[in-house]
């Protein structure tokens, strides 16, 4: 079984081309493959197949809005094997992979996701490095809530970017004090507000057009970056300053991306890196069933 390994600002993924939808992505198999000791190690898996093929195989009950049967679809799985609606960094890596693998020749096309079709612009893409902008679509305000870390309460805004986020701006945080926070355990949150769990972002307020952010992703843990999380963070940071639109550079442990928010919609621009490709041993994979 062929694979590629890539990352978007060090949020890393195993890419599995599966045009005929023959790979059984059971939760135990996904978890083993993403385990950094048992398997290849990754924050998630990106299965590459056409949306129509996934629907025909029963992986998708129906085509999400804005997605046609002929669109390439990012079937995304978290590291624990759970299915996720959307991953902004994953879309960038996915689009880069399509170009690098010769599966897509256009600079602008739609990547299907469970959160709907995501138009992308591939600014550059070679065998290793790419730069991609993703139209992340509508950013929806869910209302105010709070996260708790080591007994400290961080007030924030619930934001839907195709998946749920709780973005907490703390005016007293600096880059140094942010890096000192313990995110090894999942932050506390209101399960009544977020019944399906939530991705939690803690960030500084905007300074010179930029914020610093850390994220704890549901089903994964703390990651070096989270694309949808950077969109939620930028939106929350702008609203913290009384603005509904603007461009924010979001610095995460894995690098930097640029988020533009306007008219209730957002775009995400950032790098993608493809670092390796190879073949998984069939005996190992089949032994996980």
Swiss-Prot record:
Coiled coil feature spans: none
Active site, UniProt feature: 87, 226
Reaction(s) this enzyme catalyzes, per UniProt: (2S,6S)-2,6-diaminopimelate = meso-2,6-diaminopimelate
Compartments where found: Cytoplasm
Primary localization class, coarse: cytoplasm
InterPro entries: DAP_epimerase_AS, DAP_epimerase_DapF
Alphabetical keyword list: Amino-acid biosynthesis, Cytoplasm, Isomerase, Lysine biosynthesis
Protein name (database record): Diaminopimelate epimerase
Organism of derivation: Rhodococcus jostii (strain RHA1)
Lineage: Bacteria, Bacillati, Actinomycetota, Actinomycetes, Mycobacteriales
């Amino acid at each position: 079984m062929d694979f590629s390994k890539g990352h978007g600002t060090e949020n890393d993924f195993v890419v599995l081309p599966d045009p005929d939808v023959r790979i059984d992505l059971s939760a135990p198999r996904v978890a083993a493959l993403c385990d950094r000791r048992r398997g290849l190690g990754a924050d998630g898996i990106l299965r590459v197949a056409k949306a129509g093929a996934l629907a025909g195989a029963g992986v998708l009950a129906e085509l999400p809005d804005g997605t046609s049967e002929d669109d390439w679809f990012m079937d995304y799985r978290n590291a624990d094997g759970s299915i996720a609606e959307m991953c902004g960094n994953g879309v960038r890596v996915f689009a880069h992979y399509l170009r690098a693998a010769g599966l897509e020749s256009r600079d602008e096309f739609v990547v299907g996701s469970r959160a709907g079709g995501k138009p992308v612009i591939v600014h550059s893409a070679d065998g290793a490095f790419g730069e991609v902008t993703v139209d992340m679509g509508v950013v929806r305000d869910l209302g105010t809530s709070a996260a708790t870390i080591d007994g400290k309460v961080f007030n924030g805004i619930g934001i839907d970017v195709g998946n749920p986020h709780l973005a907490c701006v703390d005016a007293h945080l600096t880059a140094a004090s942010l890096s000192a926070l313990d995110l090894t355990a999942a932050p506390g949150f209101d399960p009544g507000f977020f019944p399906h769990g939530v991705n939690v972002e803690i960030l500084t307020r905007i300074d010179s057009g930029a914020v610093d952010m850390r994220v704890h992703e549901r089903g994964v843990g703390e990651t070096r970056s989270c694309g949808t999380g950077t969109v939620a963070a930028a939106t929350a940071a702008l609203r913290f300053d009384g603005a509904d639109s603007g461009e924010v550079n979001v610095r995460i442990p894995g690098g930097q991306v640029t988020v533009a928010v306007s008219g209730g919609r957002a775009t995400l621009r950032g790098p993608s890196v493809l670092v390796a490709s190879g073949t998984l041993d069939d005996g190992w994979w089949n032994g996980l069933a």
